[in-house]
Regions:
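Short glycine-enriched loops at secondary-structure junctions
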Residues: 127-131, 243, 292-295
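ATP-dependent carboxylate activation and anion-phosphoryl transfer catalytic cores
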Residues: 6-7, 263-348
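Anion (oxyanion) recognition and catalysis
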Residues: 27-28, 116-117, 164, 280
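Phosphate-binding site of ATP-dependent enzymes
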Residues: 18-19, 156-157, 166-168, 179-269, ...
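Rossmann-like NAD(P)H-binding beta-loop-alpha module
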Residues: 144-167
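A short linear hydrophobic-aromatic micro-motif
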Residues: 170-172, 207-210, 283-288
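Conserved N-proximal alpha/beta basic substrate-recognition cap immediately N-terminal to
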Residues: 11-25, 34-149
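Extreme N-terminal starter segment of soluble prokaryotic enzymes
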Residues: 1-4
Length: 348
């Protein structure tokens, strides 16, 4: 199997990233794993997608640091590959990372991924599905039963009324963004500072005002979903809990949250079942659900991370489960002579 990974920038990849772990799992099973940045893609006069890509030497990697050193260093194979010749292309770049410094790069993976998809490459997650999820408004397309009450606006008065209706406690965050950046917890005693919070967020666009869930004090759970089902391998769920530190309401790891073992309950599995039809419809192969209590806080479809954290607590290499699924998809395409739409193949 020839698999490609599109990332923001090869040289900023880290050994703990899920993309790095997936590439190692693929190489260790004898597959070709090519990595390319969003700036490395091209559409040539031959009407094919090409990319300046890197591949680490084929060997049995036991160290992620060694793999990444090989990939980013002189030992790597550096070639201008034909992306159309790949079996699978995984879009693992995070558009929000490029929003300010490289706005042109936000849609690059999706744009080139669509062409590769039309040329017969299995592109995951489905680029047309990803285009619907370019901001957090996508979350509002899922049933209201699984979401906190939400207002999305730039109007300060509307936000104040909404917060008041919620009893003075709410969460404010930007419509576009990730990593826990620009997230505020508004409490009744914060009323004098509410205008300042709103002004800070409206400078960058729309604001999401959201019901605060008291269970958030215990942190949230990241549960992976693959092919529309909870990712389970060797009897273990790919999940972990993120616990906030001190008075910081954000449990996101990038914002200083700590990781703990997660216990997956029937409530969590029911949430997956409720959102499954939409994820399947949009061709979302690998997704991270962020759960607080009996509600979803976020559905992460762009480069969801944390498989390594789940492995730490469950002692199971979930990356192998993902590669297993990719191998099956490639086999299906061969058996049926590529007689499947990408969105169908994404969750088979």
């Amino acid at each position: 199997m020839r698999i490609g990974f599109v990332v923001n920038d090869i040289m900023t990849e880290e050994s703990g990233y899920t993309t790095t772990r997936l590439a190692i799992a693929a190489i260790n099973r004898g597959h070709e794993a090519w990595v390319m940045g969003v700036a490395d893609l091209a559409y040539d006069p031959d009407e094919k997608i090409h990319a300046r890509a890197r591949s680490a030497p084929k060997r049995n990697y036991k160290s992620r640091d060694t793999y990444l050193s090989d990939l980013q260093g002189k030992k790597a194979r550096v070639e201008r590959i034909t992306v159309d010749d790949l079996d699978v292309l995984m879009l693992r770049n995070d558009p929000s990372t490029d929003a300010i410094a490289r706005p042109w790069a936000q849609n690059a993976g999706i744009i080139f991924g669509r062409v590769a998809m039309r040329h017969g490459v299995i592109v995951l997650n489905d680029p047309n599905g990803l285009s619907k999820a370019m901001n957090k408004m996508y979350f509002q397309l899922f049933p209201a039963d699984v979401r906190p009450k939400t207002l999305i606006t730039r109007d300060a008065d509307e936000i104040k009324r909404f917060v008041k209706d919620l009893g003075g406690t709410a969460v404010l965050k930007p419509l576009q963004g990730s990593g826990g950046v620009g997230v505020f917890l508004v409490r009744p005693e914060d009323r004098p500072n509410l205008n300042q919070m709103i002004e800070s967020l409206t400078r960058d666009g729309y604001i999401i005002a959201q019901e605060y869930l008291p269970e958030a004090i215990q942190g949230d759970i990241r549960l992976f979903v693959m092919n529309g089902r909870p990712l389970r391998y060797k009897g273990k769920y790919a999940a972990f809990r993120r616990v906030r530190t001190g008075d910081d309401m954000r449990s996101n790891i990038h914002a200083g949250g700590r990781k703990r073992e997660a216990e997956i309950t029937k409530t969590h599995l029911k949430l997956v079942e409720i959102v499954r039809p939409k994820l399947v419809q949009d061709g979302m192969f690998l997704v991270g659900l962020d759960i607080v209590g009996d509600k979803l806080m976020e559905i992460n479809v762009f480069s969801p991370g944390g498989l390594g954290s789940a492995q730490t607590f469950e002692r199971v290499n979930f990356n192998n489960a993902v590669i297993d699924a990719l191998e099956r998809k490639v086999d299906y395409m061969k058996y049926y002579r590529r007689n499947f739409d990408n969105v169908e193949m994404a969750t088979l």
